[in-house]
Design a protein with these regions (language model features):
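Conserved glycine-rich cofactor-binding loop
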Residues: 9, 16-17
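Alpha-helical segment proximal to the catalytic Tyr-Lys
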Residues: 120, 164-165, 240
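Substrate-binding pocket helix/loop in short-chain dehydrogenase/reductase
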Residues: 91-92, 99-104, 212
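Short, small/polar-rich loop/turn modules that mediate ligand/substrate recognition or access, typified
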Residues: 167, 172, 242-244
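Residue(s) in the substrate-gating loop at a strand-loop-helix junction
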Residues: 135
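Short C-terminal tail/terminal secondary-structure segment
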Residues: 140, 232, 243-258
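Active-site helix of classical SDR
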Residues: 115, 151, 159
């Protein structure tokens, strides 16, 4: 299928690792010129080596200064994928104000700052795609990291609110809700929540789904490419009828039918 994306421009935050890297590759393969911001030029170059149609920019969208630097270097884009995010399992009573502020700034304000600039321009051009990479945690708050769940819920609200402003235009704003996905850091996360003292990655994954995500129909980690393929379609002109949606790619974790 031709997604009709050739010649478009995209920004993918957090686009040099995990789900973000898979999204970068998927869009680039469709002929999109993808800009990937990051904190380290060396790490960006290493992660993006060999990918056609990609540009690395040293700027951290997780800070106000970094977002401003990115906007200065790339004033316009057709597609904005707000993928940047962090997470940390932590008992609720131990989550400090600093923890709350940090995760909110990275997970929520990074997308707010960039959308505040690029979204009005998309409306002016009468075409654009804003995509927030949220999580099933946005509607099924994980007790092991409540602060993370709050940020993912916030993304759902922001996305739907922006979509309401697109009425009658060719701009769409949607959210993707991945479930637990195989990416950098997931092995350590699974070990941290495991009851075993030193589980193998396979044991930790099995226990996680049995104890913490028992409603999953997939009963395994999702591969990053399985998320990226959905993002590529939602980025496409072919997805024009999908707007203001929270799209599930969580392996059937959520039991509701709507």
């Amino acid at each position: 299928m031709d997604l009709q994306l050739k010649g478009k421009n995209a920004i993918v935050t957090g686009g040099s690792a995990g789900i973000g890297l898979a999204i970068t590759k998927a869009l680039a393969a469709e002929g999109v010129t993808v800009t990937v911001p990051g904190r380290s030029k060396e790490k960006l170059n290493k992660a993006l080596a060999g990918i056609i149609n990609v540009k690395a920019i040293v700027a951290d969208p997780g800070t106000a200064e970094g977002a401003a630097a990115l906007i200065q270097q790339v004033p316009d884009t057709d597609i904005l994928v707000n993928n940047l995010g962090i997470y940390e399992p932590k008992p609720f009573a131990e989550i400090t104000d600093a923890d709350w502020l940090k995760i909110f700034e990275v997970n929520v304000l990074s997308g707010v700052r960039l959308s505040r600039h690029y979204f009005p321009r998309m409306l002016e051009h009468n075409w654009g795609r804003v995509i927030f990479i949220s999580s099933e945690s946005g509607v099924m708050t994980p007790p092991e990291m409540i602060h993370y769940g709050v940020t993912k819920s916030s993304q759902l609200a922001i996305s739907r609110g922006l979509a309401e402003l697109t009425k009658g235009t060719a701009v769409t704003v949607n959210t993707i809700m991945p479930g637990p996905t195989r990416s950098e850091g997931i092995v350590d996360f699974l070990k941290n929540v495991s009851s075993a003292p030193n589980p193998t990655p396979e044991q930790a994954e099995k226990e996680f789904f049995e104890k913490h995500r028992s409603s999953s129909l997939l009963q395994r980690l999702i591969e990053s490419e399985e998320i990226a393929s959905l993002v590529a379609f939602i980025s496409s002109p072919l997805s024009a009828a999908t707007n203001g949606a929270s799209l599930r790619a969580e392996g059937g974790l959520l039991r509701s039918i709507a």
